[in-house]
Amino acid sequence: MLEVVLPVIGGKLLKHFGVFQKEQERVLINYVMYFALPILAFKAGHQVKLGLEVIKISSLAWVSIVLCMSVAYIIARLYKLSNKDLRTFLLVSSFGNTAFLGYPYAFSYFGQEGLQTAIIYDNLGSFLMVSFLGVMVASGKPDLKEVFLFPPFLGLVFGFALRGIPLHPSLDKALNFVDHSTLPVILFALGLSINLSGIRDHLKLSLLAILIKVSVSILAVYLVGRFIELSPVAFKVSLLESAMPPMMFSAVLALRYNLNPNLAFASVGLGIALSFLYVPLVVKYCGGGI
């Protein structure tokens, strides 16, 4: 996964040598939030094909996110976290890295069919929920205006609305060009933001968030998925997606709403590293590739 590590290291090194400042991360995050990610969301909404199995796959993501957030809220209250720490903890404990890590893992283990399932799980499951519930948690208020005016959510809605209209090849090419920049820019911003002392300071909460995110999600998807009659590949890929560590976009929201980005980035970074160890075990447990 060199493509994952390289932009992070590049951002970290360039900050170390004074080429970039930590404060410049917000410019990059705004680029993602207001330009690149809405385009990616538009394309996802425009390409998705609705059907009963699609609804079943999406519902697995919804159930797992709600359960993770419920467990995380109880634990956060027990730890008496501050308001900003609590909201950050809820974000990193509930939403999984189902696109950035989930897509490569799904394709690697289950091929093109697995990738299609992962796209459904991510776009109509994780991304839809983080655009709605995640923004509500991050902003600290049930403000529907904030949610419905959230640029990536608007992109997803417009994509759905225009599903029956084919895109001109030139426009499609331009949109592809922009959406391919999304993940590298987020990773580079992570490199600018990452703070090793911050990881040490938040190690306990980060590990706890990862444990909640992975274990509760896997358990929820495994138990519910057995009863809703998914195809074997859809079930296995949904289980794999449920095992993804904290979502990169949770850290973006933590930055955007001035929560605790050090906790968020520590959770994301540790989660990515740990996923290389535990994901193969999840795949082996759920039956391996097709």
At which residue positions do the language-model features occur?
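Alpha-helical transmembrane segments of multi-pass small-molecule/ion transporters
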Residues: 1-290
